[in-house]
Structures are given as C-alpha cells and as structure tokens.
C-alpha cells in the first residue's frame, strides 16, 4: 500500500448523457468500487443532477472533467450544487489571477452555504498553446475514434495546421504555451488559489518523465522547475529584464495575445539585440581573420579577400 488514492477517470464528453448510459455507468462502476476506488471523474453534470450516482455511491469523491473548460465562479457553484466535490479548472486560468482570486469567493460560498469544501485543480504542464482555438476539436477527434488502433490527433496530417505549425512559424511560441511559469516561486504563487496541481503525462512518455523531474526539482527547492528552460534562456542569451517584465504581465494576460503582444515584444527585442551582437562579433572575427573557414576555401584564387571570406 502506498497511501496514494486511486482515481478512475471517465472524461469522454462525447458519450451521450442519456439515462441508459447512466444506468450502464452506475452498474459497471461497482467493479471498481468493490476494489476500493473512491474517487472518480464523471463527464456529465446532467448525470450528477439526477442524484443517482451519489445515491448508489455516497462515499465517492466526484471530480468534474477538465474538458468542460470551467472558467467562472458561477460554473463552480452550479457544479458543486450538482454534486461535484473537486473542480478541474480550464488551464487558461493560470494567466488570469483576477479570476483565480474571485474563485476563492465561490469556494467560501460552497463551504458556507452548501457545506462542501470544494477542491480546485489546475493543469500545469500540458505544453499546449494557450487559449487554443482548436482545443475542443482536438479532444473531439481523440474521443470519437471508432477503432482502438486509430492514430491520436497529433499523429494525423491535419493536426499540422494547429500546434505543430504554430511552433514552427511563431518565434514567440514557447512563451505562449499554457504551462505554469518555470520558477518555483510562480508555482507557489498559484498554489495560493488551488489545492492540487494537475500534472500531464498519461498520453506521452516524454511528458511523464518531465512531470517526475518537475516533482523532484520542486521537492529539492530548485529555483527553476523546468530543466530545459534555464539552458534555453542561456543559449539564446535572453535578457533578465525582459523575462521579469513577461512574468509580471502574464499573471493577468488571459492569453489575449491579440491585445497584449508581450511575448512577441520580448522575443523580437531579444532577437534583434542578438542579431546585432552576432553581426558585431562576425565583423570583429573577420578583422582578426578568425572563422571556421577551411584552408582550401581560404586560398581559392580570386574568390574575394581573406577578411570577407572569414566574415561570410
């Protein structure tokens, strides 16, 4: 026994919320219940509103699914009224501190008026585009595959026109993704507003290893929890003042990139400075006749001067 409770997840919101399907779910959940499962994710608020699951399994803690995109306090209250004990927020709230603060009022209301000490959870490291315009279509595709051996969304050609294309073409892509900021200090700030940090990895081997590494680094009180971030900023010589401005702005940016542009601005400014520094360095090395130029190329007759060859 590890002492870690097992949670069963049924989050396919494309399954019709019919009474027949509810009957099937209640009947077959007993197999898990009899094995000790006391936590479950249920996809439909309508099922909870009937009260039938709660009547059959009164001691089971029920979570909503993150696929319901819960973003507002009134949604929390209505879901708790329906019977949920644990709310998975939409991941975009990581950049909406104002709403996270307002959610504390809803939490207090649920405890004082409904007698439910509701728990909040926020996904930290899925690595997807913030406020993704095709998120629901991505989940729709995965949840409606008719055969078990059908490829998942990112294994299909059409998926290129979303995240893969944006990552390829947008210089600021990595500053826009819906991950918690990599500093432990920022994770602790967000923990003021939530009870549980939800970690990704169920569908990706590399992501599960990243998740375990983040947990280790948090336990070890490392300043930066994403191992690759520190080396990334050093490699591209990212200025600390720009990172500081970004950290402050994204607390409330809501992923409104069309109106904010902080990710574009810091990337453009940093790339511009690095380009100028690169040119200056190339000119200096050319003057000193330093480069990776081979002797064979250097002494090609009539090509150009040694200085220009080194510069090129």
Residue spans for each PLM region:
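Active-site pocket-lining/capping segments in soluble small-molecule metabolic enzymes
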Residues: 1-75, 84-312
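Active-site neighborhood of glycoside hydrolase catalytic domains
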Residues: 81
């Amino acid at each position: 026994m590890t002492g870690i409770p097992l949670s069963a997840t049924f989050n396919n919101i494309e399954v019709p919320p019919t009474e027949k399907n509810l009957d099937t779910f209640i009947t077959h959940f007993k197999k898990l219940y009899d094995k000790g499962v006391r936590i479950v994710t249920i996809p439909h608020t309508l099922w909870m509103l009937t009260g039938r699951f709660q009547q059959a399994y009164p001691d089971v803690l029920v979570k909503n699914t993150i696929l319901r995109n819960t973003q507002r306090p009134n949604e929390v209250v209505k879901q708790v009224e329906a019977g949920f004990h644990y709310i998975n927020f939409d991941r975009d709230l990581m950049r909406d501190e104002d709403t996270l603060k307002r959610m504390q009022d809803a939490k207090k209301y649920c405890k004082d008026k409904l007698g439910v000490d509701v728990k909040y959870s926020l996904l930290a490291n899925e690595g997807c585009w913030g406020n993704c315009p095709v998120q629901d279509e991505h989940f729709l595709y995965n949840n409606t595959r008719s055969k078990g051996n059908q490829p998942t969304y990112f294994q299909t050609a059409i998926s290129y026109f979303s995240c893969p294309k944006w990552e390829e073409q947008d210089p600021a892509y990595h500053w826009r993704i819906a991950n918690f900021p990599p500093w432990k200090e920022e994770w602790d700030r967000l923990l003021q507003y939530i009870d549980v940090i939800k970690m990704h990895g169920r569908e990706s081997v590399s992501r599960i290893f990243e998740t375990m590494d983040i947990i280790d680094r948090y336990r070890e009180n490392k300043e930066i929890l994403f191992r690759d971030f520190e080396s990334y900023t050093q490699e591209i010589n990212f200025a600390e003042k720009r990172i500081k401005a970004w950290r402050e702005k994204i607390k409330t940016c809501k992923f409104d990139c069309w109106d904010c542009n902080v990710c574009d601005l810091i990337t453009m400014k940093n790339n511009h400075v690095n380009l100028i520094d690169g040119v200056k360095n190339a000119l200096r090395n050319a003057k000193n006749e330093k480069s990776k130029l081979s002797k064979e190329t250097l002494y090609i007759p009539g090509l150009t001067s040694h200085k220009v060859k080194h510069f090129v």
